Amino acid sequence: MNTPTPSPVLSVDNLSVSFRRGDIWQKVVRNISFTLNPGETLAIVGESGSGKSVTAMAIMRLLSSRNSRTEGSVSLGGRSLLALPEEEMRRIRGAEVAMIFQEPMTSLNPAFTIGHQIAEVFIHHQGLSKREAKRQAIALLEKVRIPHAAQRYDEYPHQFSGGMRQRAMIAMALALRPKLLIADEPTTALDVTIQGQILDLIKTLQAENNTAVLFITHDMGVVAE
């Protein structure tokens, strides 16, 4: 008996992105097409300035509509992301598609504790009580192998090392078990040993949740791993 082909989590067809320079629209990403199935990993590889991160931001609908223009189609589980109202897109971000950025200090709010920021994901998207959200957040910190998670819940981003901050970002991104994880150079700022640990962690959590991973990097060594 033939095994049915899984439906793609993400389908990108002829995606192009242009930015405005004065009165001129300059195309920086041209006609990208690919599909990504559950549990699969796809790497977008290129040098700095090649449009890798712009592609990811376009998929997430995070580019300013005033100064950028996105053409083509992006479908998540059969829904056209480019056609959705912004309110619906906000619900999808985090719940169905999440992103890990290169430098977690630019994504984590320095004024709030690590635990608070992870708990807010559960409160905002799932309506959990503060007590239950805290319990879930601590469990996630343990899952991403942060030692003494209950104590570190109340620490601020500057009290975490670079590798630990990236683990916290992974916990936040995977909190709601999204169908798609976009990892934008998640190990570039880390030393080789920590880099390997973070890659192993992403692969382990991907296997547990059958998550599709879009991995953005300039490093062929990372792709090989």
Language model segments and positions:
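A short, proline-enriched helix->beta-strand linker immediately N-terminal to the Walker B motif
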Residues: 175-179
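Conserved ABC transporter NBD signature motif
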Residues: 69-80
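Helical segment within the ABC ATPase nucleotide-binding domain
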Residues: 196-210
